[in-house]
């Protein structure tokens, strides 16, 4: 009976290596498709897999062919419509189509639809939050926040050719060939010694010598059939993400839920905060999040109430800033914590309250936070709150502000606010 032993790590997913190579090769096109797809999802469905489409021309192999542009001279036998020097107009319409669903119809021509494939939840989130980090993160005395970094982790039997370890593969090849031929080599050595003795003995034993020479030839043939290198010998450099303890961090999420925030504006604010939550939980470990909702009064709430509560009212933005300052003083020592804040509002505020917001941020919050981001979600002209915050942006480097007009702006604004800088972690 013959037994087959499958030693592949990806036995049930044999194309995993090719899949990873494909994701790396077309990362730019995939990320572009993801940035477009995220705006089409519901508020609660941003962390599942995604069907990604790539234009066929982006994945086609390069090839040389005759160009279709410019002027050409051709001879058309039997032509009765044109004479020499006539210019032939280019055909109008689809002209073959690209399969993208755009353009006009054509009665002839061929094309291909865009290439569509499914990526997993982990692949989706990895690409979604690639090259993002908390700005100005500082290593404090008490280290509880864990950041994941890529490290060498020995060797693996599966991988891409670029990561192959030649030395380790040859060592495995030598060990395998030694183990598979050791017994035969011992037997061969014994037969050669016997043949030497018989050859020197008198009288000559020709039949015995012939038998020994035949056995020696068969053994050498068996030894030579053992391959020099086998797929079982190949070893690849392995990399894995390991937790890297860095520092303590807390993120304050301040959301305006006043009456001026219609449901569409609130949904866009929630999308931004869900992206922020997924980014923090995906990239860091043990980071704390403080949720604050405000209208005329501010209130610290849990995650469920922050996203689903229907409470509303007037607008006094300073109430949220005052509550944040109180929470910082009570629970988060700036010497031990990296403090971050993300504020989302439609910019509508009581006029006399906007200067107070400027004062609280300038004197109390911005001196102690690592990074403060303000996101204004509106299609109207900016009001007093935006203008007061513009003065802060020109004074404080750790203050950033962005404008979201519609749903398509959410992800680009998020990446702009949290793109990875050259020196994110400071000692």
UniProtKB/Swiss-Prot annotation:
Q: Which InterPro entries match?
A: UPF0229 (IPR006698)
- Membrane-spanning regions, if any? none
Q: Which domain of life is it from?
A: Bacteria
Stretch list, region Disordered: 84-110
Pfam families noted in UniProt = DUF444
| Chain intervals with Gly residues compositional bias | 92-102
Q: Which family does it belong to?
A: Belongs to the UPF0229 family.
HAMAP family under this entry?
A: UPF0229 (MF_01232)
Protein name listed in UniProt: UPF0229 protein YeaH
**Source organism per UniProt:** Escherichia fergusonii (strain ATCC 35469 / DSM 13698 / CCUG 18766 / IAM 14443 / JCM 21226 / LMG 7866 / NBRC 102419 / NCTC 12128 / CDC 0568-73)
Q: What is the lineage of its organism?
A: Bacteria, Pseudomonadati, Pseudomonadota, Gammaproteobacteria, Enterobacterales
What gene name is given for the protein in this entry? yeaH
């Amino acid at each position: 009976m013959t037994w087959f032993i499958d030693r592949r790590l990806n036995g049930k997913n044999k194309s995993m290596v090719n899949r990873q190579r494909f994701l790396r090769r077309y990362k730019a096109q995939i990320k572009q498709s993801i940035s477009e797809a995220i705006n089409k999802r519901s508020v609660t469905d941003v962390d599942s897999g995604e069907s990604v489409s790539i234009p066929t021309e982006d994945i086609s192999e390069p090839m040389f062919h005759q160009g279709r542009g410019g002027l050409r001279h051709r001879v058309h036998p039997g032509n009765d419509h044109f004479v020499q020097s006539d210019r032939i107009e280019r055909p109008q319409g689809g002209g073959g189509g690209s399969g993208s669903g755009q353009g006009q119809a054509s009665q002839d021509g061929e094309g291909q639809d865009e290439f569509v494939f499914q990526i997993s939840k982990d692949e989706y989130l990895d690409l979604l939050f690639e090259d993002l980090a908390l700005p100005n993160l500082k290593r404090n005395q008490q280290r509880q926040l864990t950041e994941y970094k890529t490290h060498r982790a020995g060797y693996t039997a599966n991988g891409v050719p670029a990561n192959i370890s030649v030395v380790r593969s040859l060592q495995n090849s030598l060990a395998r060939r030694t183990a598979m031929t050791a017994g035969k080599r011992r037997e061969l050595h014994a037969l050669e010694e016997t043949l030497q003795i018989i050859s020197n003995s008198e009288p000559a034993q020709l039949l015995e010598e012939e038998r020994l020479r035949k056995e020696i030839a068969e053994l050498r043939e068996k030894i030579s059939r053992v391959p020099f290198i086998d797929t079982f010998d190949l070893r690849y450099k392995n990399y894995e993400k390991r937790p890297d303890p860095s520092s303590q961090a807390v993120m304050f999420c301040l959301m305006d839920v006043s009456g001026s925030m219609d449901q569409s504006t609130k949904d866009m604010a929630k999308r931004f905060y869900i992206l922020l939550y997924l980014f923090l939980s995906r990239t860091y470990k043990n980071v704390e999040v403080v949720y604050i909702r405000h209208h005329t009064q501010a209130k610290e709430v849990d995650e469920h109430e922050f996203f689903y509560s229907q409470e509303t009212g007037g607008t006094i933005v300073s109430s949220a800033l005052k509550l944040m300052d109180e929470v910082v003083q009570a629970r988060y020592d700036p010497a031990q914590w990296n403090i971050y804040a993300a504020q989302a509002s439609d910019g509508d505020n009581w006029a006399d309250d906007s200067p107070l917001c400027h004062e609280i941020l300038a004197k109390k919050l911005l001196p102690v936070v690592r990074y403060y981001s303000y996101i204004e979600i509106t299609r109207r002209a900016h009001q007093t709150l935006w203008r007061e915050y513009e003065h802060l942006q020109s004074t404080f480097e750790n203050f950033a502000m962005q404008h979201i007009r519609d749903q398509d702006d959410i992800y680009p604004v998020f990446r702009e606010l949290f793109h990875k800088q050259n020196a994110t972690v400071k000692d």
